[in-house]
Amino acid sequence: MTTPFFKTLNRCAALVLLSVAALGATAQDYPSKPVRVLVPHAAGSSPDVVTRIVAQKLSERLGQPFTVDNVVGAGGSIGLGAGAKAAPDGYTVVIGHVGTLTINPNIYPNLSYDPLRDFAPITQSVTTPLLAVVAATSALKNTAELIADAKANPGKLTFSSAGNGTASHMAGVLFASMAGISLTHVPYKTAPAALTAVASGDVTMTFGGQPPAWPLVRANRLRALGLTSAARAAEFPDVPVLAETVKGYEVLDWNGFMLPKATPVAIGTKLHRELVAILSDPDVAKQLRAQGLNPVANTPAEFATVIERETQKWARVAKAVKLSLD
């Protein structure tokens, strides 16, 4: 004889098994239609370049289009806000970035998203130092000359960025603070626009993403002063780092793949497996490194730790320079 208690228990067990089976089927069938990859940065920016390379491979491996959708504005906050509101069904993948995930929460008091509450990390895709550049026609030949000029002429030098709260903005803020100089910030809407402003002489310098910056350097429109990493890059051994002049200075740009928080875990697991395979592919890694982008492919937990650590770092910087934006 089966008691009411065991009848209830059996029903619960059956429901659990059905739920597990449904999740398995969801992951097995996924994706069954095109997937939107939301990039909160402009076409041609570092996050965009990485995402397009990886999205093409995802399309090939999983048999459905992974289509990049650039949603720009407010230092990436508009795009992240849209990602936070997306249906948690696996058909919107969101690109998180050092600026949107760890800088903006420390300088914007009223964000439309919460990096921890609204998103589930999948994997960090790349890390990359920024490239400090001036116009090719500039009289400033190196970092020491730039600092000397800034000290001799307080308030004269300017730097552009891809917008308030972006990595290029905070790289300039931290550099000026550590070098003991004053640099006037001129925000633009996109990273390519910030670089073009330097090349045309509208502003003195910028800290640009390497994929859009190097073509302008090679075209003799920009001059590279140095990378923002702690040590020189193996791919560019002749390019100095700013830390050779400003001791201890380091800023790494990075981005990664995320999902809206309530997306089924099985879908996240499947995407993680595919992304790790893609980022570990020698041809993809070579393509990325040629542009100064270093593949990562860590676990969701490791990516979450990076977000936590970087949030604490930029909180200290924002507090030290008393930076807060409406």
What are these regions (language model features)?
Residues 27-117, 156, 164, 180-205, ...:
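N-terminal (or domain-start) structured segment
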Residues 49, 53, 57, 78, ...:
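Extracytoplasmic/secreted proteins, especially bacterial periplasmic and envelope-associated proteins
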Residues 85-91, 106-193, 242, 247, ...:
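Hinge/capping helix and adjacent helix->loop/strand transition within the periplasmic-binding protein
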Residues 2-16:
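Bacterial N-terminal signal peptides that target proteins for export
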